[in-house]
A protein has these predicted regions:
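Hydrophobic helical h-region of N-terminal Sec-dependent signal peptides
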Residues: 19-31
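Short edge beta-strand/loop segments characteristic of extracellular beta-sandwich folds
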Residues: 69, 81-90, 197-205, 213-218
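Low-complexity, Pro/Ser/Thr- and charge-rich linker/hinge segments at domain boundaries
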Residues: 41-43, 159-181, 285-286
Length: 286
């Protein structure tokens, strides 16, 4: 069973975007000289988003605790790689409970929230996202002490949320929900305590609602993976709540601590209510 989603829905994301747009209009109308239009600064946009997403909670500087890596200039705005890392110092008794990825200028800024199992040992997770315009990207970590920490990077990309899908609708339907899972390394003979890596891929169009059918030119309704959970045996590794900013055919590579469990399982649900599940034996090279 899935837990309550930690991230906002697609509709909430659009409302947030409208709220930021309203802020821009308000700032414009309050200028002393009406002829000069002034857009909100990136700091103002982030402050508005942070206040809504995190309900006014204090966000401390997360440098040295978490990190985010993205290309400064993306080659393809529809599939921009992002790697999130947990870099807590050795001896720090805390752990990261959840990561929230926010692409400030996207129509639905909360790209995904990742919740980690108690003993998962996830210190790295990477995926691909859509970026709609030049933007700050923030990563917010919630630690077990209840505090929030934030880091950011800047990405030059545009048009990712409206870029045409790589596959047509028939191809997407034919492979909908198909999964692949692969482990890296060899968690055997004493390696159960060592960090390993794995990758999960699921076929899904993850339509943003801003893309047009290339034949009819009508907008394609938003259709995306809303929840995804990965387990090692019965133990949760991570749970993702996502939206339209995750790229087509969602793909997640992550580290974890091997426990010697016999299987890995992945469950996913999209915003149309379709459920997908698969299971694999715990051995490398799948």
């Amino acid at each position: 069973m899935f837990a309550q989603p930690l991230s906002r829905s697609c509709a909430t994301g659009f409302r947030r975007w409208l709220a930021v747009s309203a802020l821009a209009m308000a700032l414009q109308f309050t200028l002393a000289q009406p002829s000069v239009a002034q857009a909100p600064t990136s700091e103002e946009i982030w402050n508005e988003l942070a206040n809504e997403i995190f309900k006014g909670r204090l966000l401390a500087d997360g440098t040295g605790l978490v990190g985010i890596e993205m290309p400064t200039r993306a080659e393809d705005a529809a599939i921009v790689p992002v790697t999130m890392r947990v870099t807590l110092p050795l001896g720090d008794p805390r752990r990261v409970k959840a990561l929230t990825l926010v692409i400030d200028e996207n129509p639905a800024p909360v790209a995904a929230t990742f919740e980690f199992g108690d003993n998962a040992g996830v210190s790295m997770i990477s995926t691909r996202v859509r970026v709609n315009s030049y933007t700050d990207v923030h990563l917010v970590a919630e630690l077990t002490d209840g505090k929030l920490y934030v880091v950011k990077t800047y990405v030059k990309a545009s048009g990712g949320c409206s870029a045409p899908a790589a596959k047509n609708a028939d191809e997407a339907r034919a492979s909908l929900g198909q999964m692949r899972f692969r482990t890296f390394g060899n968690p055997t003979d004493g390696g159960a305590s060592l960090a390993q890596e794995a990758q999960v891929m699921i076929r899904h169009p993850n339509n943003s609602g801003l893309q047009r059918d290339q034949v009819t030119l009508l907008y394609i309704p938003a259709h995306f993976i809303e929840e995804l959970a990965v387990r090692q045996g019965d133990a949760l590794l991570f749970r993702m709540n996502g939206g339209i900013s995750i790229s087509e055919d969602p793909n997640f590579r992550f580290s974890y601590l091997a426990t010697g469990a016999a299987t890995f399982a992945v469950e996913a649900k999209d915003n149309a209510g379709k459920m997908f599940r698969n299971e694999w034996p715990a051995k490398p090279g799948l």
